A protein has these predicted regions:
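Short, solvent-exposed helix-loop connector elements
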Residues: 71-84, 111-114, 206-209, 239-256
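Short, well-ordered alpha-helical microsegments
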Residues: 16-21
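Conserved small/polar residues in nucleotide/adenosyl-binding loops
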Residues: 263-269
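Long, charge-rich intrinsically disordered scaffolds of nucleic-acid metabolism proteins
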Residues: 36-155
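Phosphate-backbone recognition surface of nucleic-acid-processing proteins
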Residues: 158-159, 165, 169-247, 251
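Short glycine-rich phosphate-binding loop at a beta-alpha junction
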Residues: 5-12
Length: 269
């Protein structure tokens, strides 16, 4: 059989699927990467788990739900490079915050001589991490600047109130330059900011709520952008926030609406 007649279905495990993606591309074989939760909850009650059983469940899922197949399209080289660099940058940013916290949390409880030695070592680590972060940021900016589409998208994103470089960059990466999602609602669901109704059974009197099945990193970034809007003195989104609060809306609900508006504004542009 020709390789093009084969379809490989696998769970999408983020960066760990990269070797499989490369292998399928090299032999020109079609690849379907599915959300692990989608496979899990469509397989009924499960007992026991190992690689052999998991492989069988994935094969059964692919056989039963062939109408849901979505062939994997590899992102552009620029997007892949940005993804890898952003993962590395985020790792260093987390470590940097950790070491900065360690600089002062024990200051009043340690012998002065011991604290000075600790501080000296910490400062060295902090400087190295900051240098690495700056180098990665410069490389990412170079990639964006050399790609007309990405540069234009970055410019449009940063023209929106509350959206800075980090938020704009992560939106571009997560949406793969606005090619991954068909409409803003799908991205809002992915980011965990789209409200859903819960009106059946014991939940029939519940208010609309967001789902916890979300990309928590992009949700956090959108939240920070929305909160920054509330601290602005003026602007279209600030006016929207003030108007809804004056109408008696819950502030957190309005902030969640701002999270959605930030992306729908992006998509509209």
């Amino acid at each position: 059989m020709d390789n093009e007649q084969f379809l490989i279905c696998a769970e999408h495990t983020g960066q760990y699927t990269f070797p499989l993606v490369c292998a399928c591309k090299s032999v020109e074989c079609k690849l379907w990467l599915e959300n692990p939760s989608q496979i899990k909850y469509s397989s009924g009650m499960q007992r026991g788990k190992n690689d052999k059983v998991d492989a069988k469940r994935i094969a059964i899922y692919a056989s039963r739900f062939g109408d849901k197949v979505k062939y994997y399209d590899r992102p552009t080289e620029e997007i892949e490079r940005l993804k890898q660099l952003e993962r590395e940058r985020a790792l260093y940013v987390t470590d940097l915050a950790k070491y900065k916290g360690q600089m002062y949390d024990q200051k009043d409880f340690m012998p002065a001589a011991l604290y000075r030695k600790k501080t000296k070592r910490m400062k060295g680590l902090i400087q190295e991490l900051q240098a690495a972060i700056d180098a990665i940021t410069a490389e990412m900016e170079k990639i964006i600047g050399s790609t007309e589409v990405l540069a234009r998208q970055m410019e449009l994103l940063m023209s929106i109130d509350g959206v800075g470089k980090v938020v704009a960059l992560n939106v571009i990466i997560e949406t793969e330059a606005f090619s991954r999602f068909d409409n803003p609602r799908k991205f809002c669901c992915h980011a965990g900011v789209a409200p859903f109704s819960y009106t059946s059974g014991s939940s029939q009197h519940s208010k609309n709520k967001v789902s916890h099945r979300a990309n928590k990193n992009i949700k956090k970034l959108l939240h920070m952008a929305a909160v920054s809007v509330t601290h602005r003195k003026e602007g279209e989104l600030k006016a929207y926030y003030m108007r809804k609060v004056e109408e008696g809306k819950n502030k957190m609900s309005v902030i969640n609406a701002l999270r959605c508006l930030l992306y729908t504004s992006d998509a509209a542009d």
